[in-house]
Amino acid sequence: MPPQPGPGRSRAVSGTSVGMFAIVVLIWLLSLVVVALPAYGAAWLAGWEPVTVTILACAAWTASAALVVARPVEAALARLLYRSLRRPRPAELARIAPALERVCRRAGADPGRYLLRVEEKRQVNAFALGGHVLAVTRTALELPDDLLEAVLAHELGHHRQLHPLAIILGWWYLLPFEAGDRLVRAIRRITRWLARSFGRLSDRTGGLAGGRGPEGALGMLVLLLLLGVLVVAGTVLVVVLGVVWLPLALLVRLAKVLSAALSRAGEHAADRHAAELGYGPALIQVLGLFLQVERSVPRPRGMAALLRSHPSCQARIEAISRGRPMGR
């Protein structure tokens, strides 16, 4: 059996972890721009001190991330993001808890710090979320003990190296961009609809002389003028937002690409963690369950490949085989 870390080493920050948190910092800084602009504008319109309000808004937004790592909020977020996630039933808990305890004993970690969850899916899978959530699918519970422990050792590796914490913080700080992107898209749709309405109304006003009364003609012209103003205003707003939004969107896309690359590196790091605990051969067996399906699906290319969060199972098996220690 490989050397076991001491009980005090429940967390281990790696280069991958540092890279992930660096991306979180970048996303946080960019999110401050998205938060600051409307805060400044709203304060200016309300007659308040814009700079003070903007600073307070940015500080509140920064501090809000502390909510994400609170255990009750973490559990609620996990349920929100994974609809079929639930607490383990007594029989399931009797299956997971001893397996996790054996893995944590090898790793020198405290099994009591983790929130165990079961996902209702008919495939072998598991994931770690935030600082505490550790979930397995119902089908994963049907694995033999050594394979289930290998899956848990992999997810424990993510938690020990803080990967899920960085991912959930990055997700949280990306929310303003998601809201801003939806707003820009909505403005574009409304502007296009107004432009089409303006065109149809312009065609109709061509027949104003054909029997329409002066009052009706005047009303149509006023409506046409109003629509024209709205179309121009919407177009200007779309252009201005595009000029402001495009650099931010490009930086966010770059951050997502880098984050995906680090996520793939994190998977290899979690595999190494499991292998160092002696679960390398068992983890290879688990990954082998996905090889046939993986080979039948076309490999992603272009941006899809860059945004892929997991390396291929074949690549992971080869990496574990090259570096795995002897043992269980």
Each model region followed by its residue ranges:
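Peri-catalytic and regulatory segments of divalent metal-dependent proteins
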Residues: 70-165, 296-298
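Canonical alpha-helical transmembrane segments of integral membrane proteins
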Residues: 25-40, 175-182, 219-231
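Metalloprotease/metallohydrolase-associated module, dominated by Zn2+-dependent proteases
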Residues: 2-6, 188-282, 287
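Active-site metal-coordination segments of metallo-dependent hydrolases
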Residues: 82-97, 255-273, 308-311
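Catalytic Zn2+-binding segment of zinc metalloproteases
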Residues: 156-175, 280
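Active-site-proximal gating segments in proteases and membrane effectors
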Residues: 107-131, 257-261, 274-328
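N-terminal low-structure segments adjacent to metalloprotease catalytic domains
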Residues: 1-67
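Transmembrane alpha-helices and immediately adjacent membrane-cytoplasm interface residues
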Residues: 50-83, 101, 247, 251-259
